[in-house]
Every structure is written in C-alpha cells, then in structure tokens.
Amino acid sequence: MLQIKNLNIEHRRDLRVILENFNLVLNTGDKAVIVGEEGNGKSTLLKWIFDPALVAAYAECSGERILGAERLAYLPQELPDALKEKSVYEFFSATDAFFDCSPKELSEFAARFRLSPEFFYGEQRMDTLSGGEKVKAQLLRIFLERPTVLLLDEPSNDLDLATLELLESLINAWEGIVLFTSHDETLIERTATVVIHLEQLKRKSESRYAVVRDTYARYRQQRAELFARKTQQAENERKEKRLRDEKYARLYNSVERALSSVSRQAPGEGKNLKDKMHVVKAMGKRFEKEDAEMTEMPEQEEAIFFRLGGESAVMPQGKTVIDYALAELKTPDGERLLARGIHLKLRGPEKLCIIGENGAGKTSLLRRIAADLLARKDLRAQYMPQNYEDLLDLERTPVDFLDSSGDKAVRTKIRTYLGALKFTAEEMDHPMRELSGGQKAKVLLLKMSLSDANVLILDEPTRNFSPLSGPVIRSLLAAFPGAVISISH
C-alpha cells in the first residue's frame, strides 16, 4: 500500500500553493493516472513520492509518505544529465539487478521490448539514442530491479505505436501499484483504474484535487454532467434571486414612501407602517442569509487559448516547400544505416507526418530537413526539437526568450499571450529550468506564432501536453495555413 497524508506543496519562489491537504491511498493492483494542466504539479507530486529531495530546491513540502515494504521505481520525464554521457552498458551495469539476471532472463527482458540482448552491452552514449530508445532503456532497467510501485512520468513520450501497445500491456499486467502521468488519452483510457485530477483555479491562486476510482472516460463524462447540473442550479437560484430582489425592492420602496408621507394627525397609521418596515427589514436580513447559502457557480480549468498562423503564414498552393532526396540516412556517427532511397515532396500548405519504429531515424531525418529549410530565404521556417533544451536557455525567463529587445509594448503583448497559455505573472519571470515540460513546449509554440512562420518543423509536438491542451494543439496544427512537417506517434 502507498499512502500520502496531508501533503502540502508550495512553490518557494512565488509562494503559489501547488497542492493543499492532499491525501491518497493506492492499493496493490491500482493503476492511477495523474491528469491536469501543464504546470499544475503532476511531475512534482511524482518526484516527491519517490524522493522528497528531488523537489526541495524549488518547493516547500510538508506531509507524510507511508510506503511500508513497497519498493519504488521512478521514470523521469527526461533522461537525467548525469546519465547522458554514460554508455548503454554503463547505464545498465550501474544497478546490481543487471548482474543478478541470467543471460536467459536478460534475453527475455530484451525480447519483451523488441530489442536484441546485445542492446544491454552497447557502447553507444545514452544521449545519442532516439527519444523512444531512451525511454525503453529506462523502463528496461526499472523492470530489472523488480520494484513493487512504478512511478512513471510521461512514459509514452516518443514511443512508436508497437512500443505503446507493449507499454499498455505491461501496465495492465503489473501486479503492484502504477502511478503515472501521460498526455496519451488512449493509454490513459485503456489502463487507468484511478484518476487523480490536479487543478489550479482563480489564476492559479487556489489548488483543488479529486481522486476518483473509475475510468478516465467515465470520470470526464460524470464531471461534465455534474458541472452542467451545478451550473444550471446556480443559474436558476440567481434568476430566482433577481426576481425576489426586484419584488423586495418594490415592497421596501413602497413602505418607505408611505412612511415619508404619513400625516402626524394619523399616529395609528404611522405605527402600522413602522411595524411593517420592521417586518420588511427582517425579511431582507433573511434573504441575505439565504444568499450566503446559495449554490456557488462551479469553476473548472479551461483549455488554453492560442492562435497559430495569421495571414502572413499562408503558403501559396503551388509553392515547393521541399523536394528532398537522400540516398542513405545514417546515424549521426555514420556507423549505422537507417534508411535508403528517401524522396519527399511537399507543396503549399500540405501537412507531412513522419512515422516509424523507435530508432528508425525519424528525428535524424527531421534534423536534416530542418537544417535545409531554416537556411532558406524564401521561407520562414521554425523548428521545435524533441529536446527543448536544444533551443531554450534554461536560465532565461520565458519573456526574455521571446523578446530580447526590452521594448515595453512588445513585452506587454508577450505577457498577454503567455497569460492566455495559463502562465501566471510569476511564472513568466521564472527561469525556464523551473517550468514543466508542457510549459516549455508552450513557450516554443508561442515563439513560432510570434515569428509569423509559414513552415513548422515539429518533433513530437504534443508530448508533455495535458489531455485538455492536446486537442487544442492538434486542431491548431490542422488549421495552420502554412506547411507542417511533423513526427508523431
């Protein structure tokens, strides 16, 4: 059993409450997903459960973890810097569990992930693996260690379709506890038996959470129905209040006018009117008490508001965007052949998606295409890499990254756009190393929007986006008036 009691998490820099009085009990066999908007604390919660020291630099935490005999394993959203320069063999041999496995067991583990046993002994550096291969390697090492609790932060990132199906089956077959975050609605719906929803309301000044033992689809449906019922009830009560207040105002004014015009020669009538006014005022006080008990208008987080591509992004129908031929595609070190006879043509506002298995060369191909298109003077191309840090200086703030001129009007405009993407005023001035993966992705997409690009080159653009933001991004890309070249699973 995994239990969390009265957990409170507050951001050290802006004192924003991320979680307040959070309580959770997970039992053997539970598959729990944490959902919520970007920057709502999903990754922070996973890190704290695994090791509170992982969040101590930026968050003040209080609460109790009760783990009992559970053995925890954690898959971070990104490969830690300390592991990037290690070879694949060094990565696996760093755990005793690797040497405790027989060659037969290692072979069986590798086969489950559609890898050869030689993968364990590779000399290739971890940071040169494809995004999907990095995730596979980390998952493999976790399974070798035989934990009882899996803490997985976006485990579906960069995985091909076959490996996504494997991940789904591994989660469903896991006999212990699984707690994970994911932007993949299909994975969530097919695996999760518990939904943990983290919300930040009132411009992220109020934290709220819900824990529901149900499927994600039913939770969303029931939540929408409850929201609609409460909204209707609150609106009905407010409508009745308006009618009641209007009637009360007429009564009050009528008695007040009568009192002001009563003759001194009619003391009995004056007394009756004063008694009536006393009753009317008592009625008003009763109404005030009733108003305090009215159903509150329900609140929920809204999806991000974002624009991608205006008139300047329109691509003429006949314009050749790429006519790309490549005899051979090899790994960056030139040692492994990935593909032969590649020929791609893209004209006008067409949308091109590159798919394939992990390690097939999708990112390598996209990088070469990006290098060509970014150098073209007849196009305005923008590139969003799989690794955001390739373009982002993590010590800079989002505002500084998006505008280096310092112009007040420009910065005001940028802050308005960031606000529409659910950034608080404080988050706009945080170093980007403190932002979540989804928030970093938002910064890059906003950079593309501000640049008036007419060609977007995107490597897994929806990774790290919440299930609420993901559909918005997909619809924006589909409606983009320029060309799009993208990798996606």
Model-derived segments and spans:
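Generic structural signal for residues positioned in beta-strands
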Residues: 3, 247, 286, 305-307, ...
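ABC ATP-binding cassette signature C-motif
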Residues: 1-230, 314-489
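Coiled-coil termination/hinge junctions
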Residues: 295-321
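Extended, highly charged alpha-helical segments
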Residues: 89-109, 198-303, 407-409
